[in-house]
Regions:
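The feature captures the beta-strand-to-loop junction immediately N-terminal to the Walker
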Residues: 39-41
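Hydrophobic anchor residue at the start of the ABC signature
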Residues: 137
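Conserved ABC ATPase signature
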Residues: 123-127, 131
Length: 247
């Protein structure tokens, strides 16, 4: 069963001589419960696809179908600075009309699950970058969405913090059987996290290759299996860039 389906999707920004086509004729299926990493060079339209799936924008042509609801997590935590971690995580439930006691209990469980229990009463400026992203992950999970959309959520973090958050995300996704569409330009990150890696060409972005990830979990980003797959995918990306440069 498909959780996300894009058929012949194109997106153009602007009109006339200033028009820029970000993605062209994209076909993409994400199965329910699948973790798909969308990989490509900067500017290839990865974030555009995420915005289309999240219904933050509409395609110029083609169709986008999502089975259920979505939650979006960005590279920056986007936590409200005047709210505590607890209040930030409770907010989507409050907006959805969840009773106060229930949302407080659920938020507390989520905060503890991402190892922020002792920081629940802190505000974002009192947290490290990794802690803020943990809070953002808890808030995304609080929406109880069917599809989790992640736009380079760990791109600004140091390697050790990123690796820790990979473990935490992996545990949350497996426990909740979430469907994830994860945008990254980090090949090893994609091999570490994904069930499948989808490669996009330089702009206008097109899906050019798909790699299943048959590596048993739990995975380590420095494992030989991850390194071997990352090398194969990197070769594909290099070919895409060279082909684009040759015109």
């Amino acid at each position: 069963m498909s959780a996300v389906s894009l058929r012949h999707v194109s997106k153009t920004f602007g009109i006339g001589g200033r028009a820029v086509t970000a993605v062209a004729d994209v076909d993409l299926e994400v199965r329910a419960g699948e973790f798909v990493c969308l990989l490509g060079a900067s500017g290839c339209g990865k974030s555009t696809i995420l915005n289309l799936v999240a219904e933050l924008d509409a395609p110029t042509s083609g169709t986008v179908e999502v089975a259920g609801t979505t939650a979006l997590m960005f590279q920056e935590s986007a936590l409200f600075p005047w709210l505590t971690v607890q209040a930030n995580v409770e907010l989507p439930m409050k907006l959805a009309g969840v009773p106060k006691d229930e949302r407080r209990e659920r938020a507390t469980r989520l905060i503890e699950s991402v190892h922020l229990g002792t920081f629940a009463r802190k505000r974002p400026h009192q947290l490290s970058g990794g802690m803020r992203q943990r809070g953002a992950l808890a808030r995304a999970l609080a929406q109880d969405a069917d599809v989790l959309l992640m736009d380079e959520p760990f791109g600004a973090l140091d390697a050790m913090t990123r690796d820790t958050l990979h473990d935490e995300l992996d545990a949350q996704v497996r426990e909740r059987r979430l469907t994830v569409l994860f945008v990254t330009h980090n090949v090893r990150e994609a091999a570490r996290l994904g069930d499948r890696i989808v490669v996009m060409s330089p702009r206008p972005g097109r899906v050019t290759a798909s790699f299943d990830v048959p590596i048993e979990r739990p995975r380590r980003i420095d494992s030989p299996e991850v390194a071997t797959l990352a090398a194969t995918v990197t070769d594909q990306l290099r070919e895409e860039v060279l082909a684009h440069a040759r015109g």
